[in-house]
């Protein structure tokens, strides 16, 4: 079930997202403080995929999360992550589709994102949704790691 991050206790969302970040992204993971700052930053939208109707329980389980920043013309995807046990079940696609719909409702003319060139599953997902490559930022993550910049067709 996809919900706005505000529908579950903030400490729960922050803690679970930070734990997922650490597992998924290692040294590049967002800390709890970074997640909390993103939640409170202006013009941000964050969505969570939670297990079942867990929003009604005391301990909802966050399976995946995604967010974007909208500046009045473009929306930029800040992050998408899905816990390893829940990957390859369509959660990332559902989150991405919901982000795109939300950004368009706000008036975004296009959606931008950046992704590591070696993140093959993410690249396939974005291409399936019609995102195209705009460029390459060399050594963005580390000296040997590059990142592609994509945008959704208008």
Where do the PLM segments sit?
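Residue-level recognition of the GNAT/N-acetyltransferase active site
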Residues: 83, 87, 114-118, 143
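Short glycine/proline-centered loop/turn elements that form peptide/ligand docking sites
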Residues: 96, 119-122, 139-144
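Conserved catalytic-core motifs of GNAT/GCN5-like acyltransferases
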Residues: 33, 114, 132-148
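Acetyl-CoA-dependent GNAT
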Residues: 1-89, 96-106, 154
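Conserved active-site tyrosine of GNAT-family acetyltransferases
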Residues: 21, 126, 131, 151
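Conserved GNAT acetyl-CoA-binding A-motif
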Residues: 103-114, 137
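Conserved beta-strand segments that form the floor/walls of ligand-binding pockets within enzyme
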Residues: 76, 81, 112-114, 135, ...
């Amino acid at each position: 079930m996809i919900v706005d991050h505000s529908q579950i206790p903030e400490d729960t969302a922050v803690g679970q997202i930070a734990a997922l970040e650490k597992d998924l992204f290692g040294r590049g993971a967002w800390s709890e403080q970074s997640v909390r700052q993103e939640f409170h930053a202006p013009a941000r939208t964050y969505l969570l995929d939670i297990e079942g109707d867990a929003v009604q329980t005391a301990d909802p389980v966050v399976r995946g999360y995604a967010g974007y920043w909208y500046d009045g013309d473009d929306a930029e995807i800040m992050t998408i992550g899905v816990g390893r046990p829940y990957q390859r079940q369509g959660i990332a696609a559902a989150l991405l589709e919901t982000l795109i719909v939300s950004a368009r409702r706000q008036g975004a003319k296009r959606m931008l994102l950046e992704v590591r060139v070696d993140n093959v599953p993410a690249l396939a997902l974005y291409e399936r949704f019609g995102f195209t490559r705009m460029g390459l930022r060399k050594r963005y993550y580390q000296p040997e790691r590059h990142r592609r910049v994509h945008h959704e067709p208008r």
